Amino acid sequence: MVTSVLSSVTISRVSSVLNRDVKQFGKQFLFDGREETCWNSDQGSCQWVLMEFPQNVLVSQIHLQFQGGFSCQTCALEGCYKDGELVKIADFYPEDTNTLQKFTFAEQSVSKLRVSFLNSTDFFGRITLYHLDVLG
């Protein structure tokens, strides 16, 4: 049985926030469990979300829920230990849909995990993400 490895002490960073409006579109809305809030990236290619855990965690699944039209066709999952360089764990390919999508990959032990959104379905490269969870 897999469970979320995210906690209140997980540190997160994002590549950008739409119009720098963190009160309305900030990274905190990725993890709040509410259906009506979301993280919106600003325009530009290769948006990302980075999570830093207080200790090494085992990860084997990622759950994402995009807004259709503002999703990503190719994502890269990278991880490392505390001071190491990020290395690729897996590529995965979400659909352009509003539904929760789940992706499973070989279990990895990491203290940092980055999800990179390599090509947005939006013409301007924006990503709108309502839910992000990492399980292991």
From Swiss-Prot:
It comes from the Eukaryota. This is Nuclear receptor 2C2-associated protein. Keywords: Nucleus. GO terms for cellular component: nucleus. Belongs to the NR2C2AP family. It is found in: Nucleus. The gene is nr2c2ap. Signal peptide: none annotated. InterPro entries: Galactose-bd-like_sf. Its main location: nucleus.
